[in-house]
Amino acid sequence: MNTLIIIPSRLSAKRLPGKPLLKINGLSIISHVFQKARDANIGEVYVATEDQEILDDVQLNGGNVILTSNKHKTGSDRIYECYEKLDLKNIDYIINLQGDEPNIDINDLKHLNKLVKSYKVDVGTLAAEIENQSKLSNENIVKVITDKKITIENFTIAVDFKRKIKDFNLNIYHHVGVYAYKPQILKKLIS
């Protein structure tokens, strides 16, 4: 089974415009994310962007990048365009890795890839325990709510995504912003 990692990235983010090109230790955030994805060694990695500046930066740092339309409403739309332009027929899963996750643990990417392939699920995602009570009320942190504690045995269950949490008795996790989906499911999601 083959996996493709696509990292959507654009300069016009609402909270912090230009974020992908901000430097950490002399390297742009988007190039850090690309390197982490490549280091996971689970498949080819591409950045999908509408911005020439991001394309230039990623290429300068040895990354693969596809220029996409600037008309997309979501990163998923951008990812699907990239996938179509690549015209790869043997991809079983596409991992959507957000372009602002330079601290992503490559073992988490490997684990997600292994789980979706083992269980042959249509969609998988990553969530982490919320260790700080103040993060529960932070609307900028996307939450995952489940009816039971997430463990390795039930990781593949469906979850609801919420930004505003009112009932703190639920099992609430921080959504990491990484998805894995079968290409045909991604196509349905963007339709």
Predicted features and spans:
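Conserved core of the sugar-phosphate nucleotidyltransferase
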Residues: I104-S191
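Short, high-confidence coil segments that cap the C-terminus of an alpha-helix
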Residues: I42, L88-I91, Y119-D122
